[in-house]
Amino acid sequence: HRLIRRQRQMCIRDSSCSKDENNNSNNFATGIVELPALRNGANDVFVTHYTTFNGQKVTSFSMEYDKSKKHSRWIAFRFDNQTKQQNVSRSDEPFDADPAIGSQYQRVQADFGKQGYDRGHLCASADRLYSREVNEQTFYYTNMSPQRNKFNTGIWLTLEGQVQSWGRSCTSSDTLYVVKGGTIDKEDQIRGYISNDRSKPIPRYYYMALLFKKGDSFKAIAFWMEHTDSPKSTKLVDYALSIDELEEKTGIDFFPSLNDNLENALEATYSTKAWPGLE
């Protein structure tokens, strides 16, 4: 049985929230850390999918979905000591409509394949291997994005694998917060439209925003990739940027629930040397 929560509005940041001036790791945020600020447009729906794992209700992933574009604005989730587990293999569950959103607002198989695009997972199947049920949820069409095969199986897959490696390094005191998406909001960041249907944009860019709480320390980094058959580089380090720079490109406020001192410090800069395997 799939447990689903639908929610149209959520207060992400409350200006009255207390601030931890010392950036104490036990009081570093005022809300769900991985969630970006919601746009809350007329066609936007916020959804979180859950499963029951080891007798506990566990968040699978969350999204802000734009019904007018039949595409998620972003997908957010976390790796921790529980969700990092690899207990199953990819299910190849039949791709299916997301039961949390009307099927008329979702893409279908005909929008991919012969159109020249893979059904590219945003939350990758390999990101969610701790149970069969959670892996099946990654095959919802709300989690799909039209990706060129060479991109989907090339540099994007390389980045996904690196992020999974970081995520699976988590111990009981660690959490890797992940946001992924494709650009659907700005006309100059749209590659085209499936069958010239403006309700089915093709992202020109894909991105990730990462925040790693490792014990009592924090680090953050972002990645921005053009959606092309011929990547500018095969080195992930060449796609790295700061969270602030990614926010400027996307117009999305990432990790807004962090206390302000920590958010400002983490998002302004990044160190590629701090991320094993990146250099």
Question: Which residues make up each language-model segment?
Answer:
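Single conserved hydrophobic/aromatic residue that forms the stacking wall/gate
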Residues: 1-14
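Domain-level detector for secreted/extracellular nuclease and nuclease-toxin modules, and
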Residues: 16-279
